[in-house]
């Protein structure tokens, strides 16, 4: 053997390629994902569709991935950041959840959507709320963009568009 072969090259070992289950688990450790979202992310990272679905199924069986838990967390998180039930329901639909799971998640929310609308208006317009018609319209537009229904908007802004 020559001396050149005995000298370490200083190169680091390449890390082993992660399995689809390991990659999916890495995503789930960061935050909850729906089955559809997790499968989509795995296939986007170059994992074959069948392998991605098998990995997600294995993690679902083991309790690491749960669409019900994901939906309940999303409802709570969006409600706490000022979004209304219409927006939240639509977002849950984009994550591939069926209507029964969406309804169950919305029913599990223990907060009050109208109180959330009032809180959002208070944060934007002060404790007294919107005073004149222009401010009430702006508050109503804000709540509508955030996904609140008409009844919640009227109660939170004391604004009736027929005035």
Swiss-Prot record:
Pfam families: RecX_HTH1, RecX_HTH2, RecX_HTH3. Coiled coil: none annotated. One of its GO terms (biological process) is regulation of DNA repair. InterPro entries: RecX_HTH_1st, RecX_HTH_2nd, RecX_HTH_3rd, Regulatory_RecX, WH-like_DNA-bd_sf. It is found in: Cytoplasm. Keywords: Cytoplasm. Residues 1-21 are annotated as: Disordered. GO terms for cellular component: cytoplasm. Gene3D superfamilies: Winged helix-like DNA-binding domain superfamily/Winged helix DNA-binding domain (1.10.10.10). Modulates RecA activity. Belongs to the RecX family. NCBIfam families: PRK00117.2-1. This is Regulatory protein RecX. The lineage of its organism: Bacteria, Pseudomonadati, Pseudomonadota, Gammaproteobacteria, Lysobacterales.
């Amino acid at each position: 053997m020559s001396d050149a072969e005995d000298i370490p090259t200083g190169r680091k070992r390449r890390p082993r390629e992660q399995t689809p289950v390991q990659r999916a688990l890495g995503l789930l450790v960061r935050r909850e994902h729906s089955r559809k979202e997790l499968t989509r992310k795995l296939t986007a990272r170059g994992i074959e569709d069948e392998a991605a679905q098998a990995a997600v199924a294995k993690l679902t069986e083991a309790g690491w991935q749960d669409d019900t838990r994901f939906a309940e967390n999303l409802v709570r998180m969006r409600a706490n950041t000022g979004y209304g039930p219409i927006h939240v329901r639509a977002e849950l639909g984009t994550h591939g959840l069926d209507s029964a799971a969406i309804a169950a998640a919305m029913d599990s929310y223990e907060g009050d959507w109208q109180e959330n609308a009032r809180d959002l208006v208070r944060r934007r317009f002060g404790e007294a709320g919107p005073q004149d018609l222009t401010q009430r319209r702006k508050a109503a537009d804000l709540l509508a963009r955030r996904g609140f229904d008409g009844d919640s908007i009227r109660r939170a802004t004391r604004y009736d568009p027929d005035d």
